[in-house]
A protein has these predicted regions:
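Alpha-helical transmembrane segments in inner-membrane proteins
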Residues: 1-266
Length: 266
């Protein structure tokens, strides 16, 4: 029940790679090119903006995929899900430690840029950036929907799925690529968003009362977007022109759900 990109350290890995890119350029990519209004704009800044965006996107993807590769490697050795979860948490702590060291040795502008990005926000995503986000996300979402049959077969056990003719090793690799790609895309645009990906599948199961991925995946996608927008709405409620960081609100929705699921399984 605790499997998620933030718990297994995937988001932390993506965040570490982005931190290396951002802090290496003193925050110029984050503030000037990637987050700024000139991204994909006119004139000479357009090419720089695209380069900055691609650097962050590629860095997030590489960081997420490296952590996913580590988790996949240990999953072939460790049978206990609890031990695998602890390994994921330790990987996340290592990434967080490296990020802290990078912040310590970086410039004030670089630290500010990364801290603003790391708190998570939808407000810095412009309409031009959405044109990049939609096709990239749709590719991975459609690919995940094509895996409904093997995922349903996996519910009855790996041996049963193999007897039906599904290649479990190839399925795991495909799921690895899809998960890493989606995590990288969301992290690159909005920063590391916690608890949404962890809690939404459990809420969807409680609402529809089934494990059938043919229904569960679409409901989870829709519900995840609704919860994300709801959290973003709460972030904009305070007066005074300030916006609360997204990661300050998402645990208010996600943590109670996870606690409930753990108590129910007990």
């Amino acid at each position: 029940p605790l499997a998620g990109p933030d718990v297994f350290g995937i988001s932390s890995g993506a965040g570490l790679a982005v931190a290396i890119v951002m802090l290496a350029f003193g925050g110029n990519i984050a503030l000037g090119d990637f987050m700024g209004a000139d991204f994909l704009g006119n004139g000479a800044t357009a090419g720089v903006g695209v380069s900055g965006f691609l650097a962050i996107l590629i860095a997030a993807f590489v960081g997420a995929m490296l952590v996913m590769a580590v988790i996949t490697f240990f999953s072939a050795i460790v049978r206990s899900h609890t031990v695998l979860l602890i390994i994921g948490l330790m990987v996340g702590y290592l990434a967080s430690s490296a990020i802290s060291l990078l912040n310590f040795f970086s410039t004030a502008e670089g630290v500010k840029s990364y801290m603003v990005w790391g708190m998570g926000s939808f407000g810095n995503v412009s309409a031009a950036q959405v044109l990049w986000f939609i096709p990239l996300a749709l590719i991975a979402l459609i690919a995940s929907l094509l895996l409904v049959k093997p995922l349903n077969a996996m519910l009855l056990g790996e041996q049963y799925a193999e007897n039906l003719g599904f290649n479990i090793r190839r399925l795991r690799i495909i799921l690895l690529l899809i998960t890493g790609f989606l995590t990288a895309v969301v992290t690159a645009f909005c920063g590391p968003i916690a608890f949404i990906g962890l809690a939404t599948p459990h809420i969807a199961r409680l609402l529809i009362g089934t494990e059938n991925h043919r229904r569960l995946l679409p409901v989870t996608m829709l519900l995840g977007s609704v919860l994300a927008l709801l959290c973003n709405l709460f972030c904009t409620l305070p007066s005074g022109g300030g916006i609360i960081p997204l990661n300050a609100v998402t645990p208010l929705f996600g943590a109670p759900v996870i606690i409930y699921v753990l108590l129910k399984r007990r």
